[in-house]
Amino acid sequence: MNKPLFIALDYDDQEKMWLFLNQLKDKQGLHVKLGMEMFYQYGPEIVRDLSAKGYQIFLDLKLHDIPNTVKRTAHQLAALGVYCTTVHALGGKQMIQAAKEGLIEGTPAGKPVPKLLAVTELTSISEEVLKNEQHCSLNLADEVKSLAHQAQEAEADGIICSPLEVKAMKSEFSDDFMFVTPGIRPKSYQKDDQARVATPGQARENGSTAIVVGRPITQAADPQKAYEEILKDWSKNDAK
């Protein structure tokens, strides 16, 4: 899939995760996102187990520390053979560059280097929070754009941002720079704790490279049907 749909496996127990995954068809090569909760509970072994079954893994740990620590951590993550992983863009260019170096150095010979994605502003962040709690003088769109340019200069492969911010800035970046967007909700689904959301089709039209979808699939009465409907909306213009 050239423009992946990552299913967010936001569970607190791996038995629940496997129960969900076993409800899906065509699991070989399926793109999934594994976050902090599962990784911190089960460690690298859960990544190896998913990888052994053919899943393409987005390991979302949002690293944010001094450059040397991030580099050494990225070196370890690269050995797991994940598709991509994340750092916080707010960690600065030196930290992002260190993460990239760690991934390159830690990737086994003959294997692809995991893609490095920089998280800009979380999709739970509103204009009010940015101004009143983070004390940022820029509006959200400009802040995200600034962090995106910083990430590109630091040789990240792409960014994580809201689907609402992609359209206005995509033309300023190279074609291979990735815009991975969570905050994806079908029209019939409530926003829950996400402040900046779009439908899969809207994200595609705005220029998203990949989308991340969790609860609308994992909590659906029929996960396979929900996945297929979201994938259809996300992929509807592929033939054009």
Swiss-Prot record:
This is Orotidine 5'-phosphate decarboxylase. InterPro entries: Aldolase_TIM, OMPdecase, OMPdecase_AS, OMPdecase_bac, OMPdeCOase_dom, RibuloseP-bd_barrel. GO terms for molecular function: orotidine-5'-phosphate decarboxylase activity. It comes from Lactobacillus delbrueckii subsp. bulgaricus (strain ATCC 11842 / DSM 20081 / BCRC 10696 / JCM 1002 / NBRC 13953 / NCIMB 11778 / NCTC 12712 / WDCM 00102 / Lb 14). HAMAP family: OMPdecase_type1_B (MF_01200_B). PANTHER family: OROTIDINE 5'-PHOSPHATE DECARBOXYLASE (PTHR32119:SF2). Homodimer. Disulfide bonds: none annotated. The active site is at 62 (proton donor). GO terms for cellular component: cytosol. The gene is pyrF. It holds the Pfam family OMPdecase. NCBIfam families: PRK00230.1, pyrF.
